[in-house]
């Protein structure tokens, strides 16, 4: 690394962590990355900028949707033309990532896509990290933003952009962690996960649509009423209790009736403890 680059990095660290009044080159300064419409700031703008400047990139996020990758596709296709390699790791966590979005990424010749199987690994996976390397410098965005439209453009998201040499401890630990996840036996290549994941995704999608469409049943609408046999039992039960008896026997043809009768054996009592078993 040149002395000039090292000096600019030190100045950037000073501005970010010691004295905000010190002038520094923005390219070497750690930063808070968020969506702020009033100031015209968007997470996606920072990611696009870093993608266009890097020599290689790695991304690890829990969720990827079409709304998230669509505005990035032009940039990613430009990187494809320039043969800038990228690795993207996502998950089947909550079956939220959209198969269409994953297929779009797979179609890029410069991008290798993997999915971490949280079910087989028996652990959650909620990382949101974007690693960009140019020459000997890493610029890493870590925080709360998945690759979804809302997360990259309008949600309240908190991310930190780290700038480090490749020998920097934090950068080394983050890159090491990424490679450990990427090389894990639970990280599956596209051809090994896509069809199975797509089937599960479509099933769950239909279930969600049905759940949204069907109204919640009203307890008033479906209020249970005793049938004639049960009414007779309740009447006789009251007589037995009023006579001071504490035992009775009901023989019913079906278990359902027994359950309903049991639920209605205390009519008129304000407390269950006042009735007998």
Language-model segments: residues:
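PLD/PLD-like phosphodiesterase catalytic module centered on the HKD motif
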Residues: 1-244, 274
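Walker A/P-loop
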Residues: 61, 243-267, 272
């Amino acid at each position: 690394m040149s002395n000039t680059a090292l000096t600019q990095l030190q100045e950037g660290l000073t501005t970010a962590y010691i004295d905000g009044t010190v002038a520094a080159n923005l390219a070497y300064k750690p930063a808070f990355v968020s969506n702020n419409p009033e100031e015209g700031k968007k997470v996606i703008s920072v990611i696009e900028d870093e993608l266009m400047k890097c020599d290689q990139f790695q991304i690890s996020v829990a969720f990827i949707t079409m709304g998230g990758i669509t505005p990035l596709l032009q940039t990613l296709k430009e990187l494809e033309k320039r043969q800038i390699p990228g690795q993207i790791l996502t998950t089947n966590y909550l079956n939220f990532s959209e198969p269409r979005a994953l297929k779009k990424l797979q179609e890029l010749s410069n991008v290798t896509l993997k999915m971490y199987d949280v079910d087989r690994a028996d652990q959650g996976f909620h990382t949101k990290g974007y690693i960009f390397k140019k020459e000997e410098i890493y610029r890493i965005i870590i925080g709360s933003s998945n690759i979804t439209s809302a997360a990259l453009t309008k949600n309240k998201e908190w991310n930190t952009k780290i700038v480090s040499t490749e020998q920097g401890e934090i950068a080394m630990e983050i890159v090491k962690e990424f490679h450990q996840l990427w090389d894990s036996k639970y990280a599956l290549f596209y051809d090994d996960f896509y069809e199975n994941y797509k089937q599960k995704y479509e099933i769950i999608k239909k279930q969600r649509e049905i759940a949204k469409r069907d109204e919640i049943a009203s307890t008033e609408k479906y209020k249970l009423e005793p049938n004639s046999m049960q009414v007779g039992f309740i009447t006789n039960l009251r007589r037995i209790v009023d006579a001071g008896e504490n035992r009775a026997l009901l023989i019913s043809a079906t278990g359902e009736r027994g359950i309903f009768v049991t639920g209605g054996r205390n009519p008129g009592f304000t407390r269950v403890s006042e009735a007998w078993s």
